[in-house]
Each structure stands twice: as C-alpha cells, then as structure tokens.
Amino acid sequence: MSKLLKKQNRKRITRKVRRAIKAVRKPRRKVVARKPMARSSAPAKVKLKDKVLFEIEHYPQTEEFTSSAACAMMVLKHVNTDFKMKKEEEYSIWQEAVNGSVWHGSKYGLAYSIAKRGGKVKILSNTKDEGYDRKLAVYENVNLDTLTASWNEMKKKSEDAHVIEEYTSNVSINSIKKALSTNHIPIVLIDANALNPYLDSSPHWIVVKGYDKDAFYINDPYSDSTITLDHDAFKQALGYDNNFHIILTDTRHKVTRKKR
C-alpha cells in the first residue's frame, strides 16, 4: 500500500475515533414523555354555605348540671328517629358524660355517650389535658388524681368507640360554619353567663343548629326554645376559660334500630 493511501486511511480512522469519542462524551438526549403532575394530597378547602339550618327537636335540661346530656339527646334524636328523649335517658347519658369533668360533662364523656349510641363523632379542641376542670376541681374540693384517672379512662373509651380528635389552636365561629356546611351538628362549649347574664360564669353546652348572614341559631338546653345570637355575640360566647371544645356528629351517618 502506498504511503499516500496509508496516510488517507489513518485520517479516516482518526475521524471515526473522534466521532466515537464525542458520541460517548455527549450521548444523545432521549425524549421522555412527561408524567402528569401528581395532585396535592392536601384536603380540599371547604366552601362555607351562605346559610344552613337543621331541624333539631329541642330538649330542655331538667337539672342545672345536665346540659351535656340534653345536647347529646337532641343530636341523637336527629340521627336516630327511634331515640326517645326521656328524663331517664338524660340521667343515663349524664352519668357517662360527667366522667372526666367535675359536674358539667367532659369532651370525652360527651363524645363517648353519643358514639356509644351509634353516632359518628369527632372532637375539635384546643387542649390536650383536663384544662379548666382542674381549677373547678380545686374549687369544688374534688381530688385531682381521681379527676385525671377518670379523664384518661374516658379518653381511652372514646378512642375505642372510634371517636376522632383534632387539636387546633384556632377554634372559631368559622370552625362551626365549616362543620354545619359539611353536614355535622356541633355541640359547643360556652360560658353560661354569655347567654344569660343572670347565670354565674360556668361551663355550659349548647347545640348549634344553623346560621345565616345575620345570626347563629342555637338550641340552648337551659331555655325552652331556639335562640338567636348575632355573629359577634356568638364569637364572644365561645369557650370557657380559654378552653374551646366542639363535639361534631355526622348527620349523614343515620342510626337505625337493630332488628331483633
């Protein structure tokens, strides 16, 4: 082979090698089909309704200390038409609801008494302990260890009854609007004095049956009928001693009497 041909062959080989090296250094870019963006798993924002009003039969408490039981009975009657709102049932529920509190009914006792009778219940609260009940226990000369033991027992019973609890620092009237807008009836802790200036300041439970742009509509077991409170007044009434508790019952979960 002539020197000229050898030289030309070397040039060809050199060019091939260079192209091969470039191909290794810069691989061809593959076209990959884009996957659709995954949707956020965050819960959808609830759109508040302009107005909501549940038809909830009113039941007045028969004793100064049974507001929790009276409220539970009103809610249970709404989700279970067979439920009988009688004084005997009021006492039976109060004996459960009072556990974990001094006398008015704890959030766990109240939630458990509804769940035990078939309700689907959720607690919305800003506290994880006995809260104001410790102060009441000292005032009423109730043993704190006994109170704590009872409180823990009812918490466990509530969990066993599938009661869900959500802690939040922002329990507000919007929390109640959201509950009503999603078909939940709220039983709300308030200061009794905020509704009735003739009553001493004390923890008291009420049923909120609805709202509109002007007011909230409340079944107060201490009164004989539904009362109305404008938004500002209701906001001021919420909670007791900076403790805010709302017991929510899902109205879509209807309770039916078991066939024998």
Language-model features: locations:
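Active-site-adjacent structural segments surrounding the nucleophilic cysteine of cysteine proteases
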Residues: 2-149, 153-160, 169-170, 199, ...
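Noncatalytic regulatory segments and standalone regulatory/sensor domains
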Residues: 98, 180-181, 187, 191-260
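Short amphipathic alpha-helical surface micro-motifs
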Residues: 103-105, 167-171, 189, 226-231
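Short amphipathic alpha-helical segments and helix-helix/interface helices
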Residues: 110-111, 173-177, 235
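Internal catalytic-core helix/loop-beta-alpha segment
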Residues: 149-190
